[in-house]
A protein has these predicted regions:
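Histidine/acidic residue-rich metal-binding segments in metalloenzymes
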Residues: 171, 212-312, 326
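Active-site mouth loops of central-metabolism enzymes
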Residues: 129-142, 199-213
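Histidine-centered divalent metal-coordination motifs
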Residues: 107-111, 273, 293, 330
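Conserved small/polar residues in nucleotide/adenosyl-binding loops
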Residues: 329-335
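N-terminal metal-binding scaffold of metallo-dependent hydrolase/deaminase domains
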Residues: 1, 21-25, 39-86, 97-100
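Divalent metal-coordination and catalytic microenvironments
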Residues: 52, 69, 74, 96, ...
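Metal-associated gating/positioning segment near the N- to mid-region
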Residues: 98-175
Length: 336
């Protein structure tokens, strides 16, 4: 309870909300992570998972039934027939479900839940309001953590974030590593670097007016403990000036080069939002390590990928809500 006339600071509000959250969740978190109240690990469990369809994750894998997976603590010790003896193991019936290695999601924005927006909105203005006081910041951070947990519940055990709110992604990563929350392993970029009028500028990326501002944001990201750096080199689908032609070049090649050189000097890989052939070439020629989304390739682009040792992270999941929705068919999908 605060005295009349005294306002709660952002830090106090976040700490208070966090404390309340942990008090209600502590027992569940400890149980789910196999910890005692003193933080020490419980006696490790030996479990035998049976009655499942096994996908082993190898390149030539095929679904295999009637197998049992033996797990000792956090390690898989054997894959045997369903009928094999398993004394000393707690048997877990998977009820004909699929059992497979954890998935890796290489392109995640934890600031959103993945659902398509019902109508256009000013994301930059929304983010300014969210970050304007401690209470809304704390609520937003809890939402970010809940979206990370949803990834884990969907079978994703590692995610790579490529643009988020403030330092929320690295905080979520660290809280998960400490066992405070349930989330996948996280490789975090926090806020990306964009330009005025560029993709995601003001929401999950900072608008840099010049190279000095871009490098200043890179240093801030380093202080937050990021695992990688994200650039917004071109426009995107939602902010295309002409519908159906995303990828207008926004960031100057000189800025791309400056950030990549400094990021590599500091030991960070650089991922770049690029959605046009021109943007991909600018990114690869100036040191980017991964192309996010990508565009149609020609021989020069293929050569640049090889020379740079870069890769493309294709992103088909944004279209899935539309592809899987019963309200969208070839007859009802807008064509203009």
């Amino acid at each position: 309870v605060y005295p009349p006339g005294r306002e709660m600071s952002m830090q106090e509000a976040e700490e208070k909300t966090t404390d309340v959250f942990y008090r209600f969740r502590k027992r569940d978190i400890l149980k789910e992570n196999g910890l005692r109240r003193n933080g020490k690990r419980r006696i490790r469990m030996k479990r035998a998972y049976f009655n499942c369809i096994l996908l082993d994750g190898t390149e030539q894998m095929e679904p295999v039934a009637h197998k049992m997976v033996l797990v000792d603590g956090e390690k898989i010790t054997a894959i045997v027939e369903d009928t094999a003896p398993c004394e000393g193991y707690e048997k877990v019936d998977l009820k004909s479900g699929y059992l497979m290695p954890g998935l890796i999601n290489l392109h995640v924005h934890l600031a959103g839940n993945g659902k398509p927006s019902a109508k256009p909105r000013d994301n930059a203005a929304l983010v300014r309001r969210i970050l304007s006081n401690g209470l809304t910041r704390a609520v937003a951070y809890r939402l970010v953590c809940s979206y990370a947990k949803l990834e884990l519940l969907g079978g994703v055990t590692t995610i790579r974030t490529v643009g988020g709110l403030a330092d929320f992604d690295t905080r979520c990563r660290d809280d998960a590593a400490k066992g405070k929350i349930l989330a996948p392993r996280i490789l975090a970029a926090n806020e990306g670097i964009s330009v005025p009028g560029g993709h995601m500028a003001g929401s999950v990326a900072v608008a840099a007016h010049n190279n000095a501002e871009a490098l200043a944001q890179l240093r801030r990201a380093g202080e937050q403990g990021v695992d990688l750096v994200k650039l917004m080199i071109t426009g995107g689908v939602m902010d295309a000036t002409q519908k159906g032609t995303p990828g207008e070049l926004k960031m100057k090649p000189e800025m791309v080069r400056a950030v990549c050189d400094e990021a590599h000097r500091l030991g960070y890989p650089v991922a770049a939002h690029t959605e046009s052939p021109e943007g991909v070439k600018v990114a690869l020629k100036n040191g980017v390590d991964s192309i996010e989304h990508g565009a149609k390739m020609d021989e020069e682009t293929i050569r640049l990928y090889k020379e740079r040792g870069a890769f493309v992270c294709t992103t088909i999941s944004p279209a899935l809500p539309y592809a899987l929705s019963v309200s969208y068919t070839h007859l009802t999908l807008p064509t203009t």
